[in-house]
Amino acid sequence: DADGTHLLPLGRKLRGLASRPNQFDGNVIDWRSGDGWVLMSRDFVPEADATGSNIRGTGSRDGLGVELVDTVTGKAQLVERPDSEATDYLADGQGNIRIKEVMPRDGTGLLTGETIYRYHPTGGGGGGWQPFSRARANSHDALEPLAVDGTRDVAFATRGLNGRLALYSVKLDGSMATELVASNPEVDVTSVVTIGRRGRVIGATYVTDRRQTDYFDPDYRKLAAALARALPRTPLIRFVGANADESQLLVFAGSDVDPGTYYRFTKATRRLDALVGARPALGGVAMGEMKAVRFPAADGTMVPAYLTLPPGGAARGLPAIVMPHGGPSYRDEWGFDWLVQFFAASGYAVIQPQYRGSSGYGDGWFANNAFRSWEQAISDV
């Protein structure tokens, strides 16, 4: 309920006879029209005594499928049969599953290193899944879909362009007509911005020293600029959600020294009301500023990094912590980081190198995720 009572878990729980472990109990892929039903992708785990049998029902189903789930009762209807090689599904915000991601295995059960994308063309027509693209591991030659916008009947997908990931729109009417919609000459375009229950795509994001957003929707472009002027100390502004008609928006604003606050913005009155802080216990606590820097590697290559110094303290003679990010396919970015701030508050300078092998800087820097070039990546650290 709205007051937080009568919680109903929607995930699929494992039974006692499950044949394998499962760390994923479901993900909402389409919120539909607000009728109380949602589309959820769910990992079906067969029962140990049903494997290979002809037992009917859910006990022998295996793999990722999609169910239509009643959020009031928890009852579910199967709408996409489980596939043991499926890894993701994308819906169009109008209750339709449009794209399926599959990672096939060879005869020994090992992944082939290929990802296959299929789609349902507009209107279906009973033809089943149609080819969308085939992508090879650590290659950006193929279209890799991120989202589907049902209001325009297009998928948004990334593909390599001049050594960087760019964003394209792809018509789902069967023509697969493709159009470039966003790119950056220095870094990869990494994600799209969606709004509302239907997941309408309104922009694309990429990270230079800070995360940037190119808004396709002119109204949201103007609104984002207005919010940036109204909240100059928290420039990391993003639209988190909206009500059905987008008359009220949930907005987040933060920075490197501010964990952030969630606001409700009412379009009719242009009123911005603070709702809750992301980390209220840190209110009034001094934070160290995060600065984008460059330093020369052993071979002279300039490596991007972030440097955070203790707040209000000396800038020289400090003990330092070098904190490389994890992976695979990852990078740090400017903004609040609780672990960095913990070390800075303890008197350390914190350096976060974006070593060769980090994602987001293009194919040349990614270097196949430092595969067979780990010595170079480690030397950058």
Task: Kindly give the residue locations of the regions a language model identified.
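Structural beta-strand/beta-sheet cores of well-ordered domains, especially the beta-sheet scaffolds
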Residues: 144, 153, 165-166, 247, ...
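Flexible loop/turn segments at secondary-structure boundaries
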Residues: 86, 139, 163-166, 188-190, ...
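Beta-propeller folds
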Residues: 1-249, 254-258, 265-268, 285
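Residues at the C-termini of beta-strands that transition into short coil/loop
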Residues: 11, 205, 276-279, 354
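Cap/lid segment of the alpha/beta-hydrolase catalytic domain
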Residues: 281-381
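An N-terminal hydrophobic leader/cap segment in hydrolases
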Residues: 258-293
